[in-house]
From Swiss-Prot:
Pfam families per UniProt: PGAP1, PGAP1_TMD
Molecular function per GO: phosphatidylinositol deacylase activity
Ranges that cross the membrane: 521-541, 560-580, 617-637, 672-692, 723-743, 787-807
Domain of life: Eukaryota
Assigned GO CC terms: endoplasmic reticulum; endoplasmic reticulum membrane
Origin species: Yarrowia lipolytica (strain CLIB 122 / E 150)
Keyword entries, A-Z: Endoplasmic reticulum, Glycoprotein, Hydrolase, Membrane, Protein transport, Transmembrane, Transmembrane helix, Transport
Active site: S130
Chain's role: Involved in inositol deacylation of GPI-anchored proteins which plays important roles in the quality control and ER-associated degradation of GPI-anchored proteins.
Official protein name in the record: Putative GPI inositol-deacylase C
Other remarks in the entry: Lacks the C- and N-terminal parts of classical GPI inositol-deacylases and may not have GPI inositol-deacylase activity.
């Protein structure tokens, strides 16, 4: 048995304008080749690969569905997969739009195939990995989507809320458009085109080092009646974090996905969501169906550990139950059951009158990891708990939960003694930040209950069971995190089973990893802000000579670094205020708007994206670190230009284009031919990021050439051009991802034509500015120059994390002004001569 991939050759340019760029496959586990023509007959599921992903990634889930179908029967599933040629969709908004458009075309063609085969199939289930999940949701918002053709979307490690990279302005627009469409539809209950849509979003947790798991949450986009967000380590029978790529082939997870796929077929919204909650939520779930029990011979339960219940009905109020009745490992929908045949059913009942119970809903098994593959089922309820025990077989513990609230010190941690009950629920009201990880030590208790810890918070379905290893568990939760809509209060809760003393301390190494995952782009935008601030220092140093970048950096560190750190703390605090955020969004260029469903959510997408104390503490640390990065990049660029300068002959003298030259004739210089050619290519073929990279390379060579001239009168200009060289080199990092998309298109699609980024205005001023530097002109400082440098620095500071692409445009604007000031100086001097 192997997996065969059969191309759907009928999907041509007649059905999609992108058919020559992308393709569609039917995937099937079979000992034979798939016969042609392809005649699908099952339930269609379409796999959408993510960034640099392959259509072949669906193999594992497809094979698991086949195994379950052969074992238990049910509807056969036909898996289709899209081949996007492993495009970098996470880096390029236009690529996302193209993939979403082709996805809709593929859906329409698949449904037509079923109709041609005499099958009444009206919709396709989508399974998206990484950016494939974003493409799946984006496709619903496009004009070529036919309503009702998609009703269920599974997404794995998909960053729904925040793009993983903000180096492209188009991708920001795509995210805003997509999320605004979904939010506005669910906000308008009378005209909701998504009323029959259900979405599942699964994150890999801390082991996913590609996409921060906080970005997968659908809470602020899709209401809980239509969407579920969860983590792999919260899912029954998975119980572990999963690497980004492994989300598609991890055995435990793909089995649960296959179970869900087979059980959501032909169900309405409520039925699909019930399946999602039972299989994936990691929290206690109830059936939607209610039933009443009349005249039940019921016995009140007694609190106590390690007791056995005879056959019959029992009830309790506000109690918690633990039992070693296990759950059939082959199904997620069975009751608590022993291999000997004894059965335990649990119900949550809304009311009790005598021996009658009203509004009872079945409590589905909640599983936690156990030793030797044993499983403990756990049920708790805030109403009446009704138990139906078929026979006395094994022990059941029934007790109330002990509640405790604990303070926490970030230096010394906290130690709590648990009570002599089944479990103790410890809340930490001040621990709300998802950026901090902890280590929890649990001493041996005296209970007969095996020790383990349940960790949960009120944000999404972040509930997991942790079994201590040598008495220690690692705790990291998804509380208040930067740039993601969050509830005002989402503290950490630990429920400790088995008694003993609990000690919790900060995991500093794990916390550093959390910071790096969330602030990778900040370490590009914040050094940019500091570079522009240092450039401002150079213009206002008050010396006759233009200072070198090393000298001005030293001045910045000695005079302004402490002030900058304090200012960073103040800015972090101010951006936590909604009034300040509203004002900064009002003056933001470009203006971004978001449409929120629930007013209880707060979103801070400025500076560090944090509110409260954490931002004021992190701001100085990041400022110092970014200053160190500026020193490092300065030394690297200066070292490179010094090395290149040795390649030029020392006897070569620079051409003496005097500042008194006619500026009109300057424009007619032969180097303008190169600028003209590049401009035409940008308009027709190349992204402007390539032109910027070429200009940076030319500037590096020019800087090295001028450095070979040791004339004292040229030192100021050498310092000036060196600063520009460092700025452009750093800005190239912003442009590199889009450039990588273009190069990948050349390699895979054999086409040099790019689908976006042909705006000549975004690059022509920079090209002319670099060309003008060959005339060795230093523009004079002015108040407007200072204001522009200050604005560019502050823009990088406030908006750089979420709009890194604007760093390029900020430099382009500065280049425009410096170019004008350079020629103004020439005209002014010519006039006086």
């Amino acid at each position: 048995m192997w997996v065969a991939y059969s191309p759907i050759e009928g999907l041509t340019t007649e059905h999609s304008r992108l058919a020559e760029k992308y393709s569609l496959y039917l995937v099937k586990s079979t000992p034979y080749d798939i016969p042609l023509p392809v005649r699908p007959s099952g339930v269609p599921v379409l796999f959408v690969p993510g960034n640099a992903g392959s259509y072949r990634q669906i193999r594992s889930i497809s094979d698991t569905c086949r195994e379950l179908n052969e074992q238990y029967g049910g509807s056969e599933i036909d898996f289709f997969a899209l081949d996007f040629n492993e495009a970098y969709s996470a880096l390029h908004g236009r690529t996302l739009l193209d993939q979403a458009e082709y996805l809709n075309d593929a859906i329409n063609y698949i449904l037509q195939m079923y109709r041609d085969n005499g099958k009444d199939v009206s919709s396709v289930m989508l399974l998206g990995h990484s950016m494939g999940g974003v493409v799946s949701r984006l496709a619903i918002s496009l004009d070529n989507y036919k309503p009702g053709t998609v009703t269920t979307i599974f997404t794995l490690a998909s960053p729904h809320l925040v793009p993983p990279a903000t180096f492209d302005g188009d991708i920001q627009k795509v995210y805003n458009r997509m999320n605004d469409f979904w939010r506005s539809n669910y906000a308008d209950s009378d005209n909701n085109s998504l009323s029959d849509m259900t979405v599942l979003s699964i994150a890999g947790g801390k082991r996913d080092t590609m996409v921060p798991s906080d970005y997968i949450s659908l809470d602020s986009v899709v209401p809980s009646s239509h969407g579920l967000s969860t983590f792999s380590n919260s899912i029954n029978r998975v119980w572990t974090g999963i690497d980004h790529d492994a989300m598609m082939w991890c055995h435990q997870l793909r089995r649960q996905i296959a179970i869900a796929l087979m059980n959501v077929i032909d169900r309405d919204v409520n039925g699909r969501m019930e399946v999602f909650r039972k299989v994936f939520s990691g929290t206690q779930t109830l059936s939607d169906a209610e039933e009443d029990f009349e005249d039940v011979e019921v016995t009140p339960v007694k609190h106590g550990l390690h007791q056995k219940l005879e056959s019959g009905w029992y009830y309790g109020e506000n109690v918690q139950v633990m039992t070693t009745h296990t759950v059939n490992q082959e199904s997620a929908f069975e009751s608590y059951e022993m291999s000997s045949g004894s059965l335990l059913r649990a119900f949550e009942c809304r009311s009790k009158s005598g021996s009658s119970f009203k509004g009872c809903r079945k409590i589905f098994p909640l599983l936690v990891p156990g030793s030797n593959d044993a499983v403990i089922a756990f049920a708790e309820t805030e109403h009446y708990l009704l138990l139906d025990v078929s026979s006395s077989s094994d022990w059941i513990s029934i007790d109330q939960v002990s509640q405790k609230s604990a303070s926490f010190d970030f230096v010394t941690g906290a130690t709590i003694s648990t009570s002599n009950t089944i479990s103790t629920d410890i809340s930490f009201p001040k621990l709300t930040s998802g950026l901090v990880s902890y280590k929890v030590s649990v001493s041996k208790g005296v209970q007969l209950v095996r020790q383990y810890v349940q960790q949960n918070s009120s944000r999404v379905y972040d509930s997991k069971y942790l079994v201590p290893h040598n008495g220690v568990v690692d705790v990291s939760f998804h509380g208040d995190v930067p740039f993601v809509p969050y509830f005002q209060s989402s503290p950490l809760h630990l429920q400790v089973f088995g008694g003993g003393h609990v000690t919790i301390r900060v995991d500093w190494i794990g916390s550093l990893g959390n910071l790096f995952m969330r602030y990778r782009i900040l370490f590009i935008s914040l050094p940019s802000a500091i570079l522009y601030a240092i450039f401002l220092v150079q213009f206002h140093a008050g010396t006759a000579r233009f200072l070198s970048l090393r000298q001005s950096t030293s001045i910045f560190i000695n005079r302004y670094l402490l002030t900058s750190c304090l200012a960073g703390s103040g800015i972090a605090y101010l951006t936590g205020l909604s009034q300040v955020r509203d004002f900064l969004h009002l003056i933001q260029i470009p203006i971004t708007k978001t449409f929120a469903v629930d007013p209880s959510y707060t979103k801070n997408d400025l500076f560090l994206g944090l509110s409260g104390v954490s931002g004021t503490v992190l701001a100085p640390i990041f400022t110092v670190f970014s200053t160190g990065m500026v020193v490092l990049i300065t030394e690297l660029v200066m070292g490179l230009t010094s090395l290149l300068s040795f390649c030029f002959k020392s006897t070569t003298t620079a051409q003496s284009e005097s500042e008194s030259g006619d500026p009109i004739s300057d424009l007619l210089h032969k180097r303008t031919v190169f600028v003209a050619v590049i401009s035409v290519l940008v308009l027709l073929f190349f992204p402007y990021q390539l032109a910027f990279t070429l200009a940076t390379v030319a500037l590096l060579v020019m800087t090295a050439y001028f450095k070979s001239n040791k004339a004292p009168q040229e030192q100021s200009f050498n310092n000036y051009i060196s600063t520009i060289c460092v700025l452009m080199t750093w800005t190239c990092i912003i442009n590199a991802p889009v450039l990588a998309v273009w190069i990948q298109g050349i390699v895979v699609q054999r086409s040099m034509t790019f689908s976006s980024h042909h705006n000549l205005v975004s690059i022509l001023p920079t090209l002319l500015f670099v060309e003008n530097l060959s005339f060795r002109r230093i523009p004079s400082g002015s108040s407007i120059t200072s204001l522009l440098l200050a604005y560019t620095s502050l823009h990088c500071l406030f908006y750089g994390m979420m709009q890194a692409f604007m760093i390029h445009h900020g430099f382009n604007l500065l280049a425009t002004w410096l170019l004008c000031m350079s020629y103004k100086k020439v005209f002014f001097k010519s006039k006086h001569e």
